[in-house]
């Protein structure tokens, strides 16, 4: 929703994401915009495509992303053993784009989201060339991308960055810590969450760093894409409805009760789409 909203104001936005298997058809329809001979263990390409009215950049690296399981976990439910390389590659590619790797377009600002993109400012910092500022966005500070310090070399990170003011985190590497320490600005999903992150109870070990940087920390309340979450046009619903035509809402409730074996009731019915975790 954020890229679409920015684009609507005239900002030229490009969204970089890994070319996961579910995006294979979309990638096949695109144009190669940039290539890497060796991106953390194999060749890779950045493919330019358009989707939902947005300019997308797909990082096509089959050795890192073309596999069974889900985005973060293997079929056994455990983290992929090379998740550090998989998401270092995403950060490295973003940094190269920021250094004019595409040739015909260079971002004015890079917005990196969560630990998976946390190394973007680290790669820009160690390169040394003029680069766009980085805004680091925290969606959930509990996920920090922590890996053994021995991974510095495989991750193509200079040892000079391994300091308390850089990527070092209790003797290990933290991708999220790197993003928070080295970015120019930090945002998160609400003003209240931004305030919570400054406390030991909710800062998950990074509250001290965030207190040091609180003048650069902004809480921006999460919104939704009103085109996607519109019950009047949502094709995934049993029946559509609107604020003035509510009949379809009752049909959706009946379907939900039937699907989950709920006892029919006239009382309120609340539904939550969420991870099952103590945080929620």
Question: Where would I find each of the regions flagged by the language model?
Answer:
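Catalytic cores of nucleotide-sugar-dependent glycosyltransferases that transfer UDP/GDP/TDP-activated
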Residues: 1-280
């Amino acid at each position: 929703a954020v890229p679409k909203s920015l684009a609507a104001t005239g900002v030229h936005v490009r969204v970089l994401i890994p070319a996961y298997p579910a995006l294979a058809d979309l990638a096949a329809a695109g144009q190669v915009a940039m290539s890497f001979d060796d991106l953390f263990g194999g060749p890779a390409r950045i493919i330019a495509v358009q989707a939902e009215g947005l300019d997308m950049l797909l990082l096509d690296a089959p050795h890192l992303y073309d596999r069974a399981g889900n985005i973060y976990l293997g079929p056994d439910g455990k983290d992929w053993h090379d998740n550090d390389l998989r998401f270092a590659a995403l950060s490295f590619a973003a940094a190269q784009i920021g250094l004019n790797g595409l040739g015909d377009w260079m971002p004015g600002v890079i917005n990196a989201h969560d630990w998976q993109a946390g190394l973007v400012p680290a790669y820009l910092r160690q390169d040394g060339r003029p680069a766009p500022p980085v805004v680091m966005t925290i969606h959930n500070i509990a996920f920090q991308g922590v890996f053994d310090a021995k991974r510095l070399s495989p991750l193509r990170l200079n040892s000079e960055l391994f300091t308390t003011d850089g990527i070092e985190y209790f003797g290990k590497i933290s991708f999220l810590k790197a993003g928070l320490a080295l970015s120019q600005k930090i945002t998160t999903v609400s003003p209240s969450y931004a305030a919570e992150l400054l406390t030991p109870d909710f800062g998950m070990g990074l509250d001290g760093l965030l207190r040091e940087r609180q003048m650069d920390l902004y809480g921006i309340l999460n919104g939704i894409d009103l085109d996607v979450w519109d019950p009047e046009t949502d094709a995934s619903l049993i029946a559509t409805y609107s604020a003035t035509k509510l009949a379809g809402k009752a049909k959706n409730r009946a379907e939900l009760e039937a699907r989950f074996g709920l006892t029919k009731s006239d009382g309120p019915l609340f539904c939550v789409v969420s991870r099952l975790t103590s945080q929620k």
